[in-house]
Design a protein with these regions (language model features):
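Membrane-lumen/periplasm interface segments of specific transmembrane helices
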Residues: 225-332
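Membrane-interface transmembrane helices that cradle and orient dolichyl/undecaprenyl
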Residues: 130-134, 170-188, 196, 215
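Membrane-interface anchor segments at the N-terminal boundary of transmembrane helices
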Residues: 104-115, 286-363, 386
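Extracytosolic helix-loop segments that constitute the early lumenal/periplasmic catalytic or substrate-binding loops
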Residues: 30-42, 46-77, 81, 89-97, ...
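Transmembrane-helix signature of polytopic, membrane-embedded enzymes
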Residues: 96-104, 124-146, 164-165
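Short helix- or helix-capping micro-motifs
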Residues: 25-28, 140-145, 172, 193, ...
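Short acidic/glycine- and proline-prone juxtamembrane loop motifs at membrane-interface regions
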Residues: 149-163
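Perimembrane helix-loop-helix junctions
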Residues: 4, 173-179, 206-235
Length: 433
């Protein structure tokens, strides 16, 4: 009988490690979505009734009445694509089980968020594959698989996870269009933008980067017809609901409901809100507070991990998790600033830096236009983590050279260690929920 010997090196190759991390990330997202009721750590769910005006009512009206909202009050202003998909999932579950309870139907709608979150992880890995060799992709996948904001949004009713999916999809689609600008890629990218804007109008923001890539390739064959077809597909798909509400109810284009004085932060200076790092707030608590906090950088650091919620667990776990995440983010930000300063001579891929500036600018503009505590929530800006991971992995792939080769090598080792610590404490945080 042939003796079987387990070969660790052959089993845990870099490719297999990336696959394992992807599977673990998906399992974590699915598990969280299954065990967490829709009313826990949700946003704007409100009553589980067709007579309410929250996200649950939006879904239930589609399932039970088969029609879109008849006003733009409160959460009914939201774009419909996520709720149409969630209503379809809830209707299928009702047909399979015969259960018509409102809580069951709303919980069933979370399936779309969970699936979108898993596909987001896949698209993020695809972006890593575009720019980084497999030997460093495992560090990025560890961060992406276990960063709490991803599985938190994947386990709740709302358009955040699906919005992130389309954000990643249009960026990846633009990268692929740049390599092959044929009709298939043009039409596919237009559909992604249209469905993305039908999920959240903010999907129009990455179009600035896509337009830049289009303009760079304007000498390619049949450029004008392709752009015309792109617009004919993307704009009607993305804007029909806004036009419908404008015509039927007079809803202003780009409308966002008032969030109330209790969340208003516009009375603080721009320096306090944007241009400083509030260390005192960072030290006070690992959790963000939308009713008190106003410092944008610190709020992003906290809400990337914990959203707008607090958790019943030993405080050292979220505190150390925040510490490791902050160190990782600050190091990557420093690397990015150096590469921007040495733009022409700095080695490595520049596109993740451009995306980081784009999405960072979008986040800052959003908080500037809507100076409310909840406008800083990281669930709106999850592409920033993907950009951070891309810059990180590109740096880890660089061969140290020059006068500071030893320092660069030491920094690379330190960042790898931070990835391990961050991953370990993210898993511990999940286990302690």
């Amino acid at each position: 009988m042939r003796e079987y010997r387990f070969d660790v090196k052959r089993c845990f190759t870099p490719e297999n490690v990336v696959r394992l991390l992807f599977v673990c990330g998906c399992i974590l997202r699915i598990w969280y979505a299954v065990v967490t009721p829709v009313t826990m750590r949700g946003h704007d769910i409100w009553e589980l009734s067709v007579n309410a005006k929250g996200k649950a009512a939006y879904l239930l009206r589609l399932v039970e009445w088969g029609k879109l909202p008849d006003s733009y009050e409160l959460q009914f202003y939201q774009q419909p694509f996520y709720y149409l998909l969630s209503a379809l999932a809830a209707a299928v579950m009702r047909g399979l089980t015969g259960i018509e309870d409102a809580a069951f139907l709303v919980n069933a709608g979370k399936v779309v968020s969970c699936i979108a979150s898993c596909f987001c992880l896949y698209l993020s890995e695809r972006l890593l594959r575009e720019f980084c060799p497999v030997r460093v992709r495992g560090y990025g996948m560890a961060v992406l698989s276990f960063t709490p904001v991803f599985w938190l949004t994947g386990g709740r009713l709302g358009e955040d996870a699906l919005t992130f999916f389309f954000m990643a999809a249009v960026i990846l689609g633009t990268v692929e269009w740049e390599k092959q600008s044929d009709w298939k890629h043009t039409i596919w990218l237009a559909v992604l933008y249209g469905c993305g804007m039908m999920t959240k109008i903010s999907l129009a923001f990455p179009a600035f980067y896509t337009a830049y890539i289009f303009w760079k390739n304007r000498k390619s064959s049949r450029f004008i017809p392709k752009m015309a077809v792109f617009a004919v597909i993307a704009l009607p798909l993305g804007l029909w609901y806004s036009v419908r509400n404008f015509v039927l109810f007079g809803q202003p284009l780009g409308y966002v409901p008032s969030m109330g004085e209790i969340l208003y932060r516009g009375d603080r200076s721009y320096v306090a809100r944007f241009l400083s790092l509030d260390i005192r707030n960072w030290l006070r608590s690992p959790y963000a507070n939308p009713f008190q906090d106003y410092n944008f950088p610190v709020y992003l650091l906290k809400s990337e991990l914990f959203g707008e919620f607090t958790y019943d667990m030993p405080v050292f776990i979220p505190t150390l998790l925040l510490l490791f995440s902050t160190l990782l983010t600050l190091c990557v930000a420093g690397i990015g600033i150096y590469k921007i300063y040495r733009w022409k001579s700095a080695p490595g891929e520049k596109r993740p830096l451009i995306w980081g500036l784009l999405f960072g600018g979008y986040a800052a503009i959003s908080y500037w236009k809507l100076p409310y505590g909840c406008s800083m929530d990281f669930r709106y800006y999850m592409m920033l983590t993907v950009c951070k991971v891309l810059v990180l992995c590109c740096f880890l792939d660089e061969e140290p050279e020059g006068h500071f080769a030893q320092e660069q090598l030491l920094l690379q080792k330190g960042l790898k260690g931070l990835c391990f610590l961050f991953t370990g404490f993210s898993i511990l945080f999940f286990v302690m929920l």
